[in-house]
Amino acid sequence: MGSTYSRLLNGAGCWLALIFASCALSAAPLPKAFINGEGPGWKAWGAADFANVNCAEDTWSWEDGVAHCTGKPVGVIRSVEPMTNFELVVEWRHLKSAGNSGVFLWASPESIKGLEKGEIKGRLPNGIEVQVLDHGFSERYEKKHGKKSDWFTSHGDVFPTGPAEMTPFPPLSGNGKRSFPSKELTKGVGEWNHYYVRAINGEVRLWVNGEEASGGTDCHPATGYLCLESEGSPIEFKNLRVRVLP
């Protein structure tokens, strides 16, 4: 009787230990989807993979795999060829508080041609923009207006520009046109941030520093150029890698 009782107690103890271990594992944070652009099909991009659209000759310079942008004038450089389905990883950091920049996906060939020839108004193409904005931009807005902006954030907005179209994933901006990030994940001025972008069949998804944050679907156009933006302040990009998909 005693030995049987002891065996029952020992068995119950083992089950309790397993239950507690399982609970501890389930409470642990999930690993981040940190995609670094390594593996089959990925290609490192540099100066030779971009063409100037409407920037000055000295706006962009490349050294040891890092793209340095002065921010002046406002404009873009584009991929040599347009793309449809692809993945992108890139790291970026602003060198000045309140810096503004972006990565354009599917920038329309018509708008790029118009910018190159100076035939259209504005300095930026039509397409889907993945915003690259420093915290200082939001802080300056909040100080001036006494509240947070309802039309932009500094943590990875995704939105259409010009006549381009997109159905944004929630949460949305006040006007319903932008996909706001579900979390505040970007780091401040001088610190490197990591973006992973998936652009497939007219759908865009953005991961910020390893966590999915924003995106949209039903994008038009869904074919076009990949562009890096110069918009007023110095910024650097590095470890830019692209995988073109069928």
Which stretches of residues belong to each language-model region?
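Bacterial N-terminal signal peptides
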Residues: G11-A24
